Regions:
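Redox cofactor-anchoring modules in respiratory/redox and cofactor-processing assemblies
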Residues: 1-131
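Poly-acidic low-complexity segments
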Residues: 26-27, 72, 135, 144, ...
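Extended aliphatic helical segments
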Residues: 28, 35, 71, 133, ...
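Ferredoxin-like iron-sulfur electron-transfer modules
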Residues: 33-41, 81-84, 119-141, 155-178, ...
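Cysteine-cluster motifs in flexible loop/terminal segments that predominantly coordinate metals
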Residues: 44, 142-145
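Iron-sulfur cluster-binding cysteine motifs and their immediate structural context
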Residues: 49-59, 97, 144-164, 181-199
Length: 205
């Protein structure tokens, strides 16, 4: 790849990043994608409010998306403060627009953000907060999920004519990467995405 091609690849337009980010249903994943793509391309790093703010925003968003220890409302307040500082202090429009995007995303649904602070991703896109499980009532034991899984996360035996006593299909959570390939090939939609933390338990606190 030529040097010219590398420069073109790096200089991704902010408009394209925004468009791709907005394809994500989860607000946290939307903001995280935008920030990571901005860091990887358009950010020049010439002013501190933008460069340091974007790195800090990424750390805070990862904390929220993974529901790391002690994550709380202070992370949201920090992100809003970072966004404001980027709008005020960034030298270029790119930094200011990134700050605006962070604030707009976080304030578009406080309920969804608060659910993340409780360990729940309502859109089921934060992979650390979800699990893939096989519904035995819908599973026809065709074995397609087993064949497509690259991580040996699925165990079970494919149904064969005139035989009985099968090992039911199951997803081993420690091996599962939540890539979603098994969901795509399942003909009966037997693979369900669930939150690892029950919403009713959170709301009752």
């Amino acid at each position: 790849m030529s040097e010219e091609s590398l420069i073109e690849e790096k200089e991704k337009k902010l408009e394209d990043i925004r468009k791709e980010a907005e394809e994500k249903a989860c607000l946290v994943q939307r903001a995280l994608y935008y920030v990571e793509e901005f860091l990887a391309g358009p950010m020049c790093g010439r002013c501190y409010p933008c460069s340091l703010g974007t790195y800090e925003a990424r750390i805070r968003l990862i904390r929220i998306s993974q529901h790391l220890e002690n994550v709380n409302d202070s992370d949201i307040k920090a992100l809003k403060r970072i966004g404001s500082k980027m709008i005020e202090g960034s030298f270029c429009k790119k930094g200011k627009d990134t700050g605006k995007f962070i604030i707009e995303t976080l304030t578009s649904s406080e309920e969804e953000i608060n659910q993340h602070l409780s360990g729940i991703c309502p859109k089921k896109e934060c992979i650390n907060l979800i699990e893939y499980v096989i519904n035995p009532e819908l599973c026809i034991m065709c074995g397609k999920c087993l064949e497509v899984c690259k991580y040996d996360a699925i165990i079970g035996e494919k149904r064969e004519p005139y035989l009985s006593g099968y090992l039911p299909f199951e997803i081993r959570q420690k091996r599962c990467t939540r890539c979603g390939e098994c969901v795509k090939v399942c003909p009966t939609e037997a693979i369900e995405v669930i939150t690892t933390k029950k919403e009713e338990l959170v709301s009752s606190k």
